[in-house]
Amino acid sequence: LREKYKLITYNRSDCQYLNDEHHEEAGDVLEAIGKTAVMFSNALNFADASLKSRAFNNDKVSAHHAIIPTKASADFSKLKEEEQRIYLLIARAYLAQFFPAYKFKQTIVTLECEQVTFKCIANLEISSGWKSLYRNDKGNEEVIGEVDALALDLTSLKVGDQGICVNSSVNPKETKPPARYTMDTLLTDLTRVAKYIRDEDLRKALIERDKNKAGEHGGIGTAATRDAIISNLFERGFLEEKGNAIVSTKSARDFYEI
């Protein structure tokens, strides 16, 4: 995508921000997206290149800015399927910066029953805004709302309202073990391994090293090297895949005990 088709910017960056001057090129970039990914034609009609999202922030840009589409265009059908998917992900994230804000009305209800306090949160969507681009995504942590929020309209409730508890139930549950790593969560955790270090001085040193680095909180490697680190662990037989999960092997656990 970058070297052959010139469709995206430097692809080994983990920065999520853009320099302010990039905003001046927004119109040209959006036009290029429309030429390359015609499936975004309708969405582009709702994009406003004059909008400036929080992603445009000079202070948050490190050595390289976020990965975005370029002003170049190409024949989408000539791209491999994997290249098509990656370009669409990058283009959609860029396009979302020029959509209106997602707006909702939140109602928080706190009530007392038999000297026990209960709390309920409900969000009523007013305008989908940029989230309309992600309607069909399932399990996307970037756009998921509050886990405990209900999609109900509770705005008619008033302070002091009374009600009757018509039923209740108790569901026995067991504490679940931490979720297995996936490639995404493992890469994310490599940016903040300091939280697992028991040596206080070493932990503080790692955190201090990453001070003022967006997205880094005492990690190992860089965005450009972490994939190689993980690949090396697979090659040495320390990691293996089980379905979508990445787990340690017996060799890795034996080595850890040495």
How would you name each of these model-derived features?
Residues R2-I258:
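Core catalytic DNA strand-manipulation module of type IA topoisomerases
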